[in-house]
């Protein structure tokens, strides 16, 4: 019987699963993966602003500055820092009607 068609049915002793081999390692592994997926999905919904802002500004290296004078490098760094400071905490919420 497929896992998708198995149903818990009420009996005299309470709720029981009609699946006789629920101790199968494949069923246990699928359950663990499902639970982990649910946890990660919830965390993503709660913290997506923090996660994606870190990925956008924290891990991305800027363009190569090889051959560029130091004064221009410093000006570029300052512009990038100002862009991060201005954007910090300001997100646009788009609501679809």
Curated annotation (Swiss-Prot):
> What GO CC annotations are associated with the protein?
host cell plasma membrane; membrane; virion membrane
Q: Which residues lie on this side of the membrane: Intravirion?
A: 44-97
Q: Where is the lipid attached (S-palmitoyl cysteine)?
A: 50
**Keyword Transmembrane helix assigned:** yes
Residues the UniProt record annotates as site (Seems to be involved in pH gating):
41
As a miscellaneous remark, the entry gives: When the channel is activated, one or more imidazole moieties of His-37 probably become bi-protonated.
Q: What is this protein called?
A: Matrix protein 2
Query: Which source organism?
Result: Influenza A virus (strain A/Chicken/Scotland/1959 H5N1)
């Amino acid at each position: 019987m497929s896992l998708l068609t198995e149903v818990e049915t009420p009996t005299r002793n309470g709720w029981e699963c009609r699946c006789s081999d629920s101790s199968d390692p494949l069923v246990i592994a699928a359950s663990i993966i499902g639970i982990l997926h649910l946890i990660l999905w919830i965390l993503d919904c709660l913290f997506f602003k923090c996660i994606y802002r870190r990925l956008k500004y924290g891990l991305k290296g800027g363009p190569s500055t090889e051959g560029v004078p130091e004064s221009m490098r410093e000006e570029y760094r300052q512009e990038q820092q100002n862009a991060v400071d201005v954007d910090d905490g300001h997100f646009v919420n788009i609501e679809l009607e």
